[in-house]
Amino acid sequence: MDKKYEKISQDLGVTLKQIDTVLSLTAEGATIPFIARYRKDMTGSLDEVAIKAIIDLDKSLTNLNDRKEAVLAKIQEQGKLTKELEEAILAAEKLADVEELYLPYKEKRRTKATIAREAGLFPLARLILQNVTDLEKEAEKFVCEGFATGKEALAGAVDILVEALSEDVTLRAMTYQEVLRHSKLTSQVKDESLDEKQVFQIYYDFSETVGTMQGYRTLALNRGEKLGVLKVGFEHATDRILAFFAARFKVKNAYIDEVVQQSVKKKVLPAIERRIRTELTEKAEEGAIQLFSDNLRNLLLVAPLKGRVVLGFDPAFRTGAKLAVVDTTGKMLTTQVIYPVKPASARQIEEAKRDLADLIGQYGVEIIAIGNGTASRESEAFVAEVLKDFPEVSYVIVNESGASVYSASELARQEFPNLTVEKRSAISIARRLQDPLAELVKIDPKSIGVGQYQHDVSQKKLSESLDFVVDTVVNQVGVNINTASPALLSHVAGLNKTISENIVKYREEEGKITSRAQIKKVPRLGAKAFEQAAGFLRIPESSNILDNTGVHPENYVAVKELFKRLDIKDLNEEAQGKLKSLSVKEMAQELDLGPETLKDIIADLLKPGRDFRDSFDAPVLRQDVLDIKDLVVGQKLEDVVRNVVDFGAFVDIGIHEDGLIHISHMSRKFIKHPSQVVSVGDLVTVWVKKIDTEREKVNLSLLAPNETD
């Protein structure tokens, strides 16, 4: 146990006490958000990411240790466990290294070498090693069933030596390091006809040293290979590797040469190549999942546009655009279908203009949220034309990824049973603008288009990572228990799908929940669930102001005492002045609270009901459409980052296609990844660097034209 903790401490830079605290709290049923928010004084203020890293690494090391014990037991049963081997297995830091050490002792299926040994050909193999002069003649003595000639007997003896040599742990380790440092991963086009859009063109004749392979390239090669477009292989310094193996023998002869050739080319290199490909893929997946997770987090934290009446506009050509107006709380007011773009007739388009204008006037629409899917560009032009008569109304292009998935889901059917899928989608688009977090949690995170190669990675690992991000953000923001959907509530610490549905049912039957104490009356919501969830649930309707803050009920008595000592009866300006000026360290001791806990309590009391998303950039509102022909090189723009990938970032600049900032145009200093400079949702100032009107591609730069670019 101590060694495991030491390893976690070394890898993650945390103390043994922090590790023990986190794992003990987890064992008691505490959730990551709860530990991060309400046990800071115990953990040394570890955040959610650090806490999860401790839990994950502990689990990984436990699995590794379990495998080591199983392998040691198997070798011990064979009576072949030496002290050196035991030490090597116990020192192994990767599961793959344990398996490499176990390989010579692993129970094997019947191989050519096994059959040869059973036929008594091992002594002949020894003769090969002794470089006996007339091996062919000696081999005649070993003719038996299955090995009818001396030549066949020698082939069997070679098989025995090949298996033994190919399982040499030291040679395999040397080969692994050689491949890692000097070999190249290559790809050639296999069937160009399967690559109609030339997506994989740069990989038609590609090579890269294994040790410097970038993750997105690994995943691209994997996808191209899977689709049958590419043939992926390795380029080795084979002669050098063969020399490693040949040096194992004191003598040389044709049979030993054959043993070396077969061991390297048929056994060891293919196995090492498989291992390297697996490790490259795992590393690439880890990077892709982390990037997707970071992008998702930033998307979920986009500032909500509260208190606005929004019209959701789901564009389409033939079937017409679906419109939905929602009030300031997200409640649907009306839906309608219009035909604003061709192939609609001129009469239909004019009618659509009147209908949209009527909706704006009738419901006091303040913002139009246009989905960025099919017919988005044409719909944007249509909306901009109508808004010439409504200077007080703006529009926003909204990323509609996943809206269709939600609108066809059981959740959407329950919410709007009498509406078509398309109208539900328009409502979702409108609500995404009002409160991105509340709406996006209804959708499988994998359907939200802010990833890179997300379909090529482990879906289980991706889901786990994205769910963690959603859980973290939901609890950091807090949830209004009286307005939240079951989907949003289910991400609150301590709550599951059943309890979340019970909360909504309780609201429907009993009316609004008016205190945190009342939450305990919800069926199936026990003491542990209440402990974990209560601090993250907000109740604006409560007579107790603490119920609408992040202050946990376990600290209400301490806060009451704090108010008494400071003579605070209301959280007015005078009270805030007292809270700001008090000595946290001294007061924490007097109240028997941890200093970090008191700091958080004061922060909540200074801004009750705060939504920290308000400090992030809001969407860019537009009133007029921009065409690629309106752009000029060197033009300055201010727009929002839509997606971040390994090679750059895509920015919504108001035309049909997002502009690309390549990583080389992000900073005058060297950066390893675009995420060091920008995040999804960031409002950035960019300059147009290159315009390709024909392909509708725009290259951007974060560097002003007068800077070194």
Model feature map: region roles:
Residues 97, 396, 402, 407-477, ...:
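Long, charge-rich intrinsically disordered scaffolds of nucleic-acid metabolism proteins
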Residues 31-32, 43, 47-148, 476-615, ...:
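Accessory alpha-helical DNA-binding modules that contact the DNA backbone or grooves
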Residues 19, 338-343, 367, 408-421, ...:
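Short beta-alpha connecting loops at secondary-structure transitions
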Residues 1-20, 27:
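Generic start-of-chain signal for non-secretory N-termini
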Residues 50-53, 60, 64-312, 316-418, ...:
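Duplex nucleic acid-engaging cores and interfaces of nucleic-acid transaction enzymes
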Residues 138-150, 206, 245-264, 268, ...:
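Low-complexity, acidic/Ser/Thr- and charged residue-rich accessory regions of DNA metabolism proteins
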Residues 177-185, 313-317, 373-378, 398-405, ...:
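A glycine-rich phosphate-binding loop feature that marks nucleotide/adenosyl-phosphate handling sites
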